[in-house]
């Protein structure tokens, strides 16, 4: 499948995978890509498969000359589902912001190398983390 930008989807998936453990290929559809990051374990006592994590997820959409994004912070529960919830621990929020900024920078650099822009979705108003200068 070729995306609106003219790039083959399979090649983009490979490039996105090389950015780190973020892309969820099974949740990517058509010209949309899904990334997430399980940044902070809520409680290490349960068995690994039953642990919950604070983290973020990002949806990326391929368009003609750019990719647009929207992201959320929240809880990745033991069933493997994301829920947007407020996070009150300063250290956790700082870690989430750091990992999101790091990923955003790598993603932006990759897209620039392909002569594509990375911009917030037109309807994405909630930008609690400053991602670009």
From Swiss-Prot:
UniProt cross-references to InterPro entries, sorted A to Z: Tscrpt_reg_Crl, Tscrpt_reg_Crl_sf
Gene3D superfamilies, per database record: Sigma factor-binding protein Crl monomer
BP-aspect Gene Ontology terms: positive regulation of DNA-templated transcription
Compartments reported by the entry: Cytoplasm
Coiled-coil segments on the chain, per record: 90-111
Keyword Repeat belongs to the record: no
Keyword Cytoplasm appears in the UniProt entry: yes
Key words of the record: Activator, Coiled coil, Cytoplasm, Transcription, Transcription regulation
Pfam family of the protein (one): Crl
Stretches for region Essential for activity: 99-122
A cellular component annotation (GO) from this entry: cytoplasm
Family indicated by similarity: Belongs to the Crl family.
Function: Binds to the sigma-S subunit of RNA polymerase, activating expression of sigma-S-regulated genes. Stimulates RNA polymerase holoenzyme formation and may bind to several other sigma factors, such as sigma-70 and sigma-32.
Protein name (Swiss-Prot/TrEMBL): Sigma factor-binding protein Crl
Organism expressing this protein natively: Salmonella newport (strain SL254)
């Amino acid at each position: 499948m070729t995306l609106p930008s003219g790039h083959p989807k399979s090649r983009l998936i490979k490039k996105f995978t090389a950015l780190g453990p973020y892309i969820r290929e099974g949740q990517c559809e058509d010209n949309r890509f899904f990334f997430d990051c399980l940044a902070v374990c809520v409680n290490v006592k349960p068995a690994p498969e039953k642990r919950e994590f604070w983290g973020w997820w990002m949806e990326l959409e391929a368009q003609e000359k750019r990719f647009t994004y929207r992201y959320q912070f929240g809880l990745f529960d033991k069933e493997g589902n994301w829920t947007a919830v407020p996070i009150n621990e300063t250290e956790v929020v700082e870690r989430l912001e750091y990992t999101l900024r790091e990923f955003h920078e790598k993603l932006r650099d990759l897209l620039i190398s392909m002569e594509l822009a990375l911009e917030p979705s037109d309807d994405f108003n909630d930008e609690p983390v400053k991602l670009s200068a």
